[in-house]
Amino acid sequence: MENIDIEKAPVISEGNKEKKGLKKWMCAKSSKFRSWWDDKRHKMDKWSRETPFRRKMWLNKTLYMMMIPYMVLFFLFTVVPVVMSFLLSFSYFNLLEAPRFIGWANYLALFLDDPIFITSIKNTLIIALITGPLGYLLSFVFAWLINELPNKLRAFITLVFYAPSISGSALAIWTLIFASDIYGYANSFLINWGLIREPITWLQDSAYILPIVIVVQLWMSLGVNFLTLIAGLKGVDRSQYEAGAVDGVKNRWQELWYITLPNMKPQLLFSAVLQISGSLGVGAITTALAGFPSVNYAGHTIVNHLQDYGTTRYEMGYASAIATLLFISAIILNKLIRKIIGRVGS
């Protein structure tokens, strides 16, 4: 665009000649500006019409501008660490020396020379296969039932379900329940009822550690998932049930499958992702209950193995290989869950 030089503008005087000259000069500059702007707008419109993606970007350019800070932070604190972890998994790196490329040696060592890692895979799969589907199902059933209650009672029960997931002392309650002396609630109950004579060392016996971890993880996972699903249930338009009754929906099960579930797919997917990440990421619970490492590695999970090599032994290349395998497993499960939830209501 040509800059408008104010100093070259005709001086306004009382004479008609000077006034006409100023008007002619301003019209010429305005015409040039309109021509320049029309040309720029035509180019931008042409660029935005080339592909559907560009068209959407142009129409929602303000929203994309607002997303830039988040995308920058996401790239720096999520994408970059994942890529760096993947690259380090092919190296030997102990924080004291520069990374040294060793190819697939870390991955081969995990599966061929590390029996504790195989144990951690087995324990993680057992926990995930039990707490994942069961926790997801229980969260939905409880949310579905409680959603029918009066508002005040529903709010109170929602708080009861959600409070343990945000309470830092929740795990301490379970250590009291499964304490190894006669003062533990579980031992006290069993002794008083004559079921046992001597207290059971729940958290020091490898036969009980994994079942206890499963129970605690299942209990801890209900809070956020329950809150997410009950929010989805509240968002379903009640008029759709009336329309469904006109279209032939005859009972509550048909309402659930054809109306309720299809209208809360975002909440179902979000809850499933939380459940998967929580089931695969079990580590803090086993450490808090059974110590690190647990007796005979009975509660040892992939996350515990990652912590062992990453924060205790500082073998960062080996730990990065573990983290990469865990990340890939989570991605595969998330893709599978998306396909399953996508068929809901069909």
What are these language model-derived features?
Residues 1-66, 151-154, 336-346:
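Transmembrane alpha-helical segments of polytopic membrane transport and secretion proteins
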Residues 56-346:
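A structural signal for multi-pass alpha-helical bundles of membrane permease subunits
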